Amino acid sequence: VKVRILGSGTSSGVPRIGNDWGDCDPAEPRNRRTRSSLLVEHDGTRVLVDTSPDMREQLLAARVGRVDAVIWTHQHADHVFGIDDLRQVYHALGHPVPGYAREDCAAALRQQFAYVFKGAGGYPPTVALSVLPDRLALGELAIRVVDQPHGSITSAGLRFDAAGVSIGYATDISAMTDAMRDLYRGVDVWIVDALRRRPHATHPDLATVLGWVDDLRPTRTVLVHMDQSMDYAGLRAELPDGVEPGYDGWEIAR
């Protein structure tokens, strides 16, 4: 199983417009964060999680021109608005890209981007969208899904299992439910939203995430969806063993 963090930043990215690096050292390349997205690959099957506004640059950096499916965690702009770039993936595949989203997210996508799913102006649809079930198999990847609180909406929490390796992905969450605990407990790698140190209404702060780590006991925890207050080197020095800041281009192969 190979996992690549395509983007590790929050909705504004780092630096924010105006060259705002906040507390992040501009000389550290791992502080430059595009909007959050993930790529999971196993035995020839590639799954893209979310189509961030930075998707084109993210896939170019990863040297990836084809994905076999897309899963959307939720309908917020920073996780969706690169959807038009799936046209190139459509051309690479030669057929509409299989896409999956929970029912509310799928409805929002169809409303905002009808042309992507129906075609328009003589152009064919580029995505074949299905409702994301609680369990899904894509190639040899077994995927389990739970609904996660994220302010007034929910996001899809994902667990990928293949070849005895388990990967959890929990972005855009505001609380930990029993279903989430069951999904993520003891995973080999847990990639989790950790927006900043100060509390936030719809994302977890660092102290909250570290409490979850103590409870869930993943083998390795990687922080993502971080804002300009979360300097890479500072986090590396501060975090306990087994917990690390993610960055754009972070990879693991197990």
Which sequence ranges carry the predicted segments?
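Catalytic metal-binding/acid-base residues of hydrolase active sites
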Residues: D54, H76, S174, L195, ...
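Binuclear metal-ion centers of metallo-dependent hydrolases, dominated by the metallo-beta-lactamase
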Residues: P133, T177-R254
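Active-site-proximal loop/helix segments of hydrolase catalytic cores
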Residues: S152-S155, A163-D193
